[in-house]
């Protein structure tokens, strides 16, 4: 509930993007630009991924802008 809700087509660098990756699992990343976001994988460490990748597109939940 902290920050402002942001529509996916209005994302800016630094916005937090949230994903539902399972029934009780959540994942968060930080938007960079041009569909890319930075996040940490327990198996691969720090990664850059794209919101348009099929996995992330289907798991996308919401975004927040913290000021």
Regions from the language model: what does each represent?
Residues 56-67:
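Glycine- and charge-enriched low-complexity intrinsically disordered segments
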Residues 50:
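A solvent-exposed, acidic/Ser-Thr-rich amphipathic alpha-helical stretch
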